[in-house]
């Protein structure tokens, strides 16, 4: 059954949630406090790194698994959007001074014990081969070959374009003051009812 869905927040999370509901055939309305030309949310400034192995250095295996899955999902989403979006999965290079090589050894041990990786510390010559512009004389490093990055602004613009073309409504400069029982209350007193409301606004929104 087709549902009427309200989404609060037009950052990367709000757009992806809206994209999924739109694909399933539901009616989607997004509320965003910014004007659409000058996003101030963190999605617009994020580096777009998809780095499950690097995350594993300080996080648990569940975060790693989510990151690994996201690499596959991004490829699928970008293919579906059929837009020019910067996306690469050519790996991440982590370097440190030779004197701090022991830190890399600990990282190697942790990553290898949680994954099927067989990471080894790179020599300065191996680093130079990967990144010729780095002065690698006193460096050691690790290369996570499966990591990647996506341009957040390009993916957001592509998602907005898709949603508009497929009948979704995006209400920019809409200040949501409250959500109660699937009703969105806007500044000025307007109240809009939905079957479901998903709050995707960021911190301090």
Description of each model-found segment:
Residues 3-29:
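N-terminal Rossmann-like FAD-binding beta1-loop-alpha1 element of flavoenzymes
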Residues 47-130:
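Dinucleotide-binding Rossmann-like beta1-alpha1 core, especially the glycine-rich loop
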Residues 23-44:
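Glycine-rich FAD pyrophosphate-binding loop
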Residues 13, 36, 204:
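Conserved Rossmann-like nucleotide-cofactor binding loop
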Residues 9, 32, 96:
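Short beta-strand/turn micro-motifs composed of small residues
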Residues 32, 123-124, 170-174:
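Short loop/edge segments at beta-strand edges and connector loops
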Residues 142-182, 186, 191-196, 200, ...:
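Helical element adjacent to the flavin cofactor pocket in flavoenzyme catalytic cores
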Residues 34-36, 127, 159:
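Short beta-to-alpha linker loops that shape the active-site pocket of alpha/beta-hydrolase fold enzymes
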């Amino acid at each position: 059954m087709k549902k009427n869905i309200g989404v609060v927040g037009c950052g990367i999370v709000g757009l992806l949630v809206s994209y999924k509901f739109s694909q399933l055939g539901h009616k989607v309305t997004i509320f965003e406090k910014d004007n659409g030309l000058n996003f101030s949310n963190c999605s617009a400034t994020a580096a777009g790194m998809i780095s499950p192995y690097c995350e594993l250095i300080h996080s648990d295996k569940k975060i790693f698994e989510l990151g690994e899955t996201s690499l596959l999902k991004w490829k699928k989403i970008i293919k579906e959007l059929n837009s020019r979006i910067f996306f690469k999965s050519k790996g991440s290079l982590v370097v440190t001074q030779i004197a701090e090589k022991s830190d890399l050894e600990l990282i190697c041990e942790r990553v290898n014990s949680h994954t099927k990786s067989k990471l080894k510390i790179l020599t300065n010559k191996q680093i130079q081969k990967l990144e010729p512009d780095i002065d690698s004389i006193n460096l050691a490093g690790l290369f996570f070959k499966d990591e990647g990055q996506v341009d957040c602004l390009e993916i957001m613009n592509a998602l907005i374009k898709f949603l508009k073309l497929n009948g979704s409504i995006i209400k920019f400069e809409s200040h949501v003051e409250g959500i109660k029982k699937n009703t969105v209350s806007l500044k000025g007193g307007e109240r809009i009812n939905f079957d479901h409301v998903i709050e995707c606004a960021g911190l301090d929104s």
